[in-house]
Every structure is written in structure tokens, then in C-alpha cells.
């Protein structure tokens, strides 16, 4: 074997990794020595700094939906064939500074402002007689953590008793890679988040619960209509060589290596008035790449924004009665970067199997979207998705009728025996991540010289792992083959387990529609196999012609799920299939059992399974809270760079203010926006809000200085729809004030730009 030499860059990266790992292990060891307790999900999770809510600014804006904590009875049963329908939407943005963005796993990709707010969108559907109901919640996050779900269910139980439960509530993430991290309890994700943020966790939980509260309050009789159609020109398979590992006979049944079908539910009241929309479609929200530092909802969020703005005329983004949820599906190997991978340094094509370049290696092989930049690519992909949903929504005519039925189990996914046939039984494995996990994907490469498709370990990395984390057992090595194990997460338990063992599996049916809530990212072919198996199981026991949709990234996150054949190639998705080569077969067996129980009315006979843990004393953020300071002679909100006197459509207004850390505002759930764009209306002699920070036309940048100093820069990209007139920009923030020997307080402030004019010539 030839002696391996390292470049100066690789040597530096290795040194950096060793130092970071040593520091991490030391911190974990310290925490484990001092704490490390486990509680069940009845724990509140509030073990950190109490939030101090300061006064908030009063803004003129359209009335927002207000939830109630009461549990009103449904109206007396009426003679209608539909469902009681309730929709609700609430802000769940969390921190937009001093926190990592979740998804790419790129060190240093921390939040530095806001492009759009993140929303939780809840849809409640109840039988006409009130006998059963379900709540489907699409949340603009990278994934749902087990801790989030347990805390949401706890709060719902305290408000509504047994009305909303683990079996009839689905929390599904859209999978934006531009949302905040910090809301996890398993060690691997805490390390990726650079600590647990109770501030963000509480904000997200409250937003999810509030969206359900609003939907619950708004329940009214209505109908559900379903439609399906294909979406073109928004997807590619980012691991086509893995897809080709699947049997030719199976691939021949499909016209594409991605699922192009969108399923849309149109929700209307008994008068036919629109209430909301749910769509499921498989594409990664990674049009915004890993150079981005602005919190946003990416392409699926832009589709939801366009739909809601069209239906909620006269309302600001995030407000209005109509709610549009663009939910994820089996997107595991599906990219929106449709121009495909190429070597960014030479323009050549990448090696298809390894996603690497002749010059520069894997870090040079990247895929790009259809736009001139990531913002334009997001708009292009999101608009196409919106337009197809709009078309399907307008033409939907097939009504969904039938009872609401639910089934749920907790399963130890590290110990599932799978009956492949009459003579062969296999098992899942303790969790582990393979080498190609560290390679990243063509949507977001890593900086390490590790390629996708790696099927053999490396002596250096194996030795480093063994010294820092201990050696993986022979059992896990054999079980995970042909995956070369980089991190044996299932055998690491200090200070808490590194990845989950206990996983939620869940099916909810609405008449002839079945929603399979999957706890991760199924690849295209994995999703097809699961849908087909569940549909056949329903048909076998009398529920024929079911439409099965996959709700991706639901309830708990367990990385990827490839087919057995794709697993052999060990590209990124396979290396991230943590429970081993038979993970998909295990899920198919488990979901078939749920389908059978629903179809045979035997759900009550099923075991609930082992309850997941709820950990206390998690590693907090390593970024301290420090007092904000304004420059000498200035106050928070003062203008440092004014707007120009005059602008035209298509230009960008830029105003710079004396700022404060925007994470302070995440401690105040009533904080609605960091900015407004306002137009002076002569007819009422007052300023009217035209845009807020949920608008895609605005951008809020936070520039961190030293010793508590910072600036806030607000951009308004003037749209074609802007009318001539006089405008201004307002900035809303909160500063942390710390006096000696006194607790910190959070104080609200605002800044106002000088007026400027939009002209036509």
C-alpha cells in the first residue's frame, strides 16, 4: 500500500479537526461528570436561562389570528359528507443570529439576519360527528426533532386533554437548510448546532402550538378535494449512479429517476370558499446554498408565500385567513439545482460515481440552480412549484370522504427483525455514519478530502476516531457492511446518546387518503417501495384504491433511508442510512403493520412501543449573551447610512441603523417583525405598512462588531408592483441591558429612515 502524504491544507484541516474534537470531548466529559440525567417526555425542557421579555413596539398592521386556550365543542353534527376543517399559521422563526443554520453541517454557516420568517402551518380535519380528528402541521424547519415533538404534545395535552395525541398529530418539516439549529437533544445534532438553544427551542414550540390553537379555534364544516399532477423542470437526482443500482425491471416501471407527482388537497367550506391547501412534493429546499447566512424558508417557502399572498389580498405576509402548506415528501436524493454538478474551477463535468473533479477533488464538484444567483434560483424553482399547485388547486374536483383513522408506534429501530421471505430474516443495526457522510453532496460539499462512494476506511481517520471516541464493535462493523464506519453513533452515549434509538412511525387516513409520516429522508425509489407496500396492505384488508402520500421528515430525525441496492454504492445518502442496509425493509414491514391495523380495526391491540427519552442538562450555546452597546453619541435605532432621496422600480433601498443583537427579539414571542416598509397615504394622512420582514422583497442583515457594538442593514428590493409615492423604512429591535449586580433586561427600540420617493421616470 502506497504511503499517503498530506497537503499543507489537509494537514491544517486535520490539526483543526483534532483540536476541535479534543475540545468537544473535554466539554462533553465535563458535562457528563456534572449532570447527564434522563427524564421521560413529561419534563418541560426549560432548564436554561429564563427569558426576560421587555416592552415591545406598537405597530399598525392588519389584525392577526389570535388563538384561544379553550376547547370549544364542535357544532352539533350536521348532515354533510365532509369534515370539520381548521387552518392556522404562526411564526416559528427563532433566533436569526448567534446560531448555526441547520442542514448543510458547515462550520461557520451561522445566522446573520433574515430573508423571510419561518412559519408553522396547521391543518385540523375532524369527522362530522367529532369522533376522531387529525392535525397535520407543516413546519418551516430543516427537520422535526424528537424533543420538539414531545414538548409540543405535552403542551397540547395540558390544553386539550386527549384531543390531540401522538397518534393523530403529525409534525412534518419542509427541510429548509436556512433555518436555525439548536432544538435537538441527541449529542450529534447538538454538536452540529454548536449547542442547544432554549431560546430558539421555546420559540419554535410556541409557534407550532399556536398554529394548532388557531386551527382548532377556526374549525368549521367543509370539504376536502384531492388532485394530482406532475411538476416539470425543478428536480434532478443528485445520486443517479446509486439509483441505477436498483433492479432494471423496477426502474423500467418509472419514466424518471425522481418522483415528479405533486398531490394537492384543496380545503373549502360548505359554500366553496377557500380555507387552505396542503401539497406534498419531493424536492430538497437547497436552492439557497451553504454560503447563505440569512434565515429563510427556501423554494418551498417561496411557493407558500406566493400562494398565500394571492389568496390573502390586502394582508401582509404571514397574515390572513388562507393557509398554504407545501410539505416535504421522499426528497432524499432529489435536488432543485437542475443545471447539475460541474467542476466550478474548470467548468468540466464531475465524476458521476464519486462526485469529484480532476483538479481540486470533491470540494470543487457542485450543482447549481437555474438562476444567476441562489436568490433567483429559489424564486424560479419556488414559482414553478407554486404554479403547478395553483393549477391543481383550481381544477380539483374529486372529493375525499370517509373516516379519520390513526395509528402510531414507537419502535427501537436498532433492533428490528425483518422477515425478507419464508427462509431469511435480517436485522437492523445500531446507528452509524459512513465515510461518505463526511463528503457532503453536490448541493453542499464538505471541505474534507473524502469522496462519495467510499467503501473502505482510512487508517488515519480510523485511528483518530478510535483514539477520541473508542473503536466500533465488531458487531456494528459487520452489521453495517459494506458501509465503512466513520462514527459509530449508536455506541456513543456520553453525555447522552448521539442519535435516536426510539423512532416514531405513524399513518393517518382520511377516507381514501393515507399519510405515512416518515422519520427521515427517503430516496426516490425507497419512497416508491413504501407507498406501494402500504397501498397493497390496505387493499389486502379491504381498503382498496388508497392514495398513499409520504410526509417527509416527520416527528423525529433519523437521517436517510436508501434501498438495499443503493446502500451498496455508499454515496452520501447510503452512508447516512444510519440503521444499516435493511433499514428500508424494516420500515416497510412496520408501516404495513400499521396499515393492517387500521384496515382491520385492530389499532387498539397494538403495543405503543418503548417510550423515547427526554434529556435534561443539554450542552448550551458556547456563544455568551453580552450587553449591547451603541456608539458614543448614538442611540439604538439611529440611522448611520440614510436612504437616497429618490429610487425607481428595480433598484435597492439600503439603510443602515445602529443595531442590537437580533437574538434578543427571539425572547419576546410578541415580536412580529424587524422591519417595515411604509408608504405615506395622503387620503388618510398616515403611514401604511406595505412590507414586513416576511416579505421576500426585504432583507435584514446584522453585522456584529466588538464589545457589543453592531449595525443593522435593511434592503428593500423595489418590486414592479410598487406605486409611486413617499416611503420610509422602520427598524424594530431589542437591546440587552446589563447593569452591575442586576439581572439583564431586554428593551425594545425602533429606528426610522428619512423619507424617500419612488418615481416612475
UniProtKB/Swiss-Prot annotation:
It catalyses: an N-acylsphing-4-enine + H2O = sphing-4-enine + a fatty acid; N-hexadecanoylsphing-4-enine + H2O = sphing-4-enine + hexadecanoate; N-tetradecanoylsphing-4-enine + H2O = tetradecanoate + sphing-4-enine; N-(9Z-octadecenoyl)-sphing-4-enine + H2O = sphing-4-enine + (9Z)-octadecenoate. It comes from the Eukaryota. Proteolytic cleavage of the N-terminus removes the signal-anchor and produces a soluble form of the protein. Keywords: Apoptosis, Calcium, Cell membrane, Disulfide bond, Glycoprotein, Golgi apparatus, Hydrolase, Lipid metabolism, Membrane, Metal-binding, Mitochondrion, Phosphoprotein, Secreted, Signal-anchor, Sphingolipid metabolism, Transmembrane, Transmembrane helix, Ubl conjugation, Zinc. InterPro entries: Ceramidase_alk (IPR006823), NCDase_C_sf (IPR038445), NEUT/ALK_ceramidase_C (IPR031331), NEUT/ALK_ceramidase_N (IPR031329). Ca(2+) binds at residues 115, 693, 695, 698. One of its GO terms (molecular function) is zinc ion binding. Glycans are attached at residues 51-52, 56-58, 60-61, 63-64, 66, 68-69, 71, 198, 412, 449. This is Neutral ceramidase. It comes from Rattus norvegicus (Rat).
Amino acid at each position: 500500500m502506497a504511503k499517503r502524504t498530506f497537503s499543507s491544507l489537509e494537514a491544517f484541516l486535520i490539526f483543526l479537526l483534532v483540536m476541535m474534537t479534543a475540545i468537544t470531548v473535554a466539554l462533553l466529559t465535563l458535562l457528563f461528570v456534572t449532570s447527564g440525567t434522563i427524564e421521560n417526555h413529561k419534563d418541560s425542557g426549560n432548564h436554561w436561562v429564563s427569558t426576560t421579555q421587555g416592552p415591545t413596539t406598537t405597530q399598525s398592521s392588519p389584525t392577526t389570528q389570535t388563538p384561544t386556550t379553550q376547547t370549544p365543542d364542535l357544532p352539533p353534527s350536521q348532515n354533510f359528507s365532509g369534515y370539520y376543517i381548521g387552518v392556522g399559521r404562526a411564526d416559528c422563526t427563532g433566533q436569526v443570529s448567534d446560531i448555526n443554520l441547520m442542514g448543510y453541517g458547515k462550520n461557520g454557516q451561522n445566522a446573520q439576519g433574515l430573508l423571510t420568517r419561518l412559519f408553522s402551518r396547521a391543518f385540523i380535519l375532524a369527522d362530522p360527528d367529532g369522533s376522531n380528528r387529525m392535525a397535520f402541521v407543516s413546519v418551516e424547519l430543516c427537520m422535526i426533532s424528537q424533543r420538539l415533538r414531545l414538548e409540543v404534545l405535552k403542551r397540547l395535552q395540558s390544553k386539550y386533554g386527549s384531543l390531540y395525541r401522538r397518534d393523530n398529530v403529525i409534525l412534518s418539516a419542509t427541510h429548509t437548510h436556512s433555518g436555525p439549529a439548536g432544538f435537538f437533544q441527541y449529542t450529534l445534532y447538538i454538536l452540529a448546532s454548536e449547542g442547544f438553544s432554549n431560546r430558539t427551542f421555546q420559540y419554535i414550540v410556541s409557534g407550532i402550538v399556536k398554529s394548532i390553537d388557531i386551527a382548532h379555534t377556526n374549525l368549521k364544516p367543509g370539504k376536502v378535494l384531492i388532485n394530482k399532477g406532475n411538476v416539470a423542470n425543478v428536480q434532478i437526482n443528485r445520486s443517479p449512479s446509486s439509483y441505477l443500482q436498483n433492479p432494471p425491471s423496477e426502474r423500467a416501471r418509472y419514466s424518471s429517476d425522481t418522483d415528479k407527482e405533486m398531490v394537492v388537497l384543496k380545503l373549502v367550506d360548505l359554500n366553496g370558499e377557500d380555507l387552505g391547501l396542503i401539497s406534498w412534493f419531493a424536492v430538497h429546499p437547497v436552492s439557497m446554498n451553504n454560503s447563505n447566512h440569512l434565515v429563510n424558508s427556501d423554494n418551498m417557502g417561496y411557493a407558500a408565500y406566493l400562494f398565500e399572498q394571492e389568496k390573502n389580498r390586502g394582508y401582509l405576509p404571514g397574515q390572513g385567513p388562507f393557509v398554504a402548506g407545501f410539505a416535504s415528501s421522499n426528497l432524499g436524493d432529489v435536488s432543485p439545482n437542475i443545471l447539475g454538478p460541474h467542476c466550478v474551477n474548470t467548468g468540466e463535468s464531475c465524476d458521476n460515481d464519486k462526485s469529484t473533479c480532476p483538479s481540486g477533488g470533491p470540494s470543487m464538484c457542485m450543482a447549481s440552480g437555474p438562476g444567476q444567483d441562489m436568490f433567483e434560483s429559489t424564486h424560479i424553482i419556488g414559482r414553478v412549484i407554486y404554479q403547478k399547485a395553483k393549477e391543481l388547486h383550481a381544477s380539483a374536483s374529486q372529493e375525499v370522504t370517509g373516516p379519520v383513522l390513526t395509528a402510531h408506534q414507537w419502535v427501537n429501530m436498532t433492533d428490528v427483525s425483518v422477515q425478507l421471505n419464508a427462509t431469511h430474516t435480517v436485522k437492523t443495526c445500531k446507528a452509524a455514519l459512513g465515510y461518505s457522510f463526511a463528503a457532503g453532496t453536490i448541493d453542499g460539499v464538505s471541505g474534507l478530502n473524502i469522496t462519495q462512494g467510499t467503501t473502505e476506511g482510512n487508517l488515519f481517520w480510523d485511528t483518530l476516531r478510535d483514539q477520541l471516541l473508542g473503536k466500533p464493535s465488531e458487531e456494528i462493523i459487520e452489521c453495517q457492511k459494506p458501509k465503512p464506519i466513520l462514527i459509530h453513533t449508536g455506541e456513543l452515549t456520553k453525555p447522552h446518546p448521539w442519535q435516536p434509538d426510539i423512532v416514531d412511525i405513524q399513518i393517518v387516513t382520511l377516507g381514501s387518503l393515507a399519510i405515512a409520516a416518515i422519520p427521515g429522508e427517503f430516496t426516490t425509489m425507497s419512497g416508491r417501495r413504501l407507498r406501494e407496500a402500504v397501498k397493497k396492505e390496505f387493499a389486502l384488508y379491504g381498503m382498496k384504491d388508497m392514495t398513499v402520500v409520504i410526509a417527509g421528515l416527520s416527528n423525529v430525525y433519523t437521517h436517510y433511508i436508501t434501498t438495499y441496492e443503493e446502500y451498496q454504492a455508499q454515496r452520501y445518502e447510503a452512508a447516512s442510512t444510519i440503521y444499516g442496509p435493511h433499514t428500508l425493509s424494516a420500515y416497510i414491514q412496520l408501516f404495513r403493520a400499521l396499515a393492517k391495523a387500521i384496515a382491520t380495526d385492530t389499532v387498539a391491540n397494538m403495543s405503543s412501543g418503548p417510550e423515547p427519552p427526554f434529556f435534561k442538562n443539554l450542552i448550551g450555546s458556547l456563544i455568551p449573551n453580552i450587553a449591547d452597546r451603541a456608539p458614543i453619541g448614538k442611540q439604538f435605532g439611529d440611522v448611520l447610512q440614510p436612504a437616497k432621496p429618490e429610487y425607481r422600480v428595480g433598484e435597492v433601498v439600503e439603510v443602515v441603523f445602529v443595531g442590537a443583537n437580533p437574538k434578543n427579539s427571539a425572547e419576546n414571542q410578541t415580536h412580529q417583525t424587524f422591519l417595515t416598509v411604509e408608504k405615506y397615504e395622503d387620503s388618510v394622512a398616515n403611514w401604511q405598512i406595505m412590507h414586513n420582514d416576511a416579505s421576500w422583497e426585504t432583507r435584514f442583515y446584522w453585522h456584529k462588531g466588538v464589545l457589543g457594538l453592531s449595525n443593522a442593514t435593511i434592503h428593500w428590493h423595489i418590486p414592479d408592483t410598487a406605486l409611486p409615492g413617499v416611503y420610509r423604512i422602520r427598524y424594530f429591535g431589542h437591546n440587552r441591558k446589563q447593569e452591575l449586580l442586576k439581572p439583564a433586561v431586554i428593551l425594545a427600540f425602533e429606528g426610522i429612515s428619512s423619507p424617500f420617493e419612488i418615481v416612475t421616470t
